[in-house]
Amino acid sequence: MVILPGGMPGSANLAIPQVGDLVRAYAAAGKIIASICAAPALALSPTGVLDGRRVTCYPGFEDAFPASAERSEDAVVEDGQVITSRGPGTAHRFALRLVERLVDGETAAQLRSGMLWDHP
């Protein structure tokens, strides 16, 4: 798995050839590619891995997505091996989705409970 974190200017700084090569290699190997905040738009879009996929990012960066991408406002979007999320307020849901994929749903549920996620 490769995870591209968000924030600015960090997301823009990830849009370099070395990161692009790494992302494309992970995609070719069928590995999970995860990204949050502005990074899906600024760092993943140039790699081509978002072409034809359903994706999300921090509001205002959507115009950087490829025309073939299906834009979503969901907190976390999973399309095949690519997982994207919107930003700081969705980071917990993003993290739990990664746990579901790396470990299993039961472990993610235990973490959710331990964090008092559903506590009133």
Predicted features by range, described:
Residues M1-P120:
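Active-site-adjacent pocket-lining segments in enzyme domains
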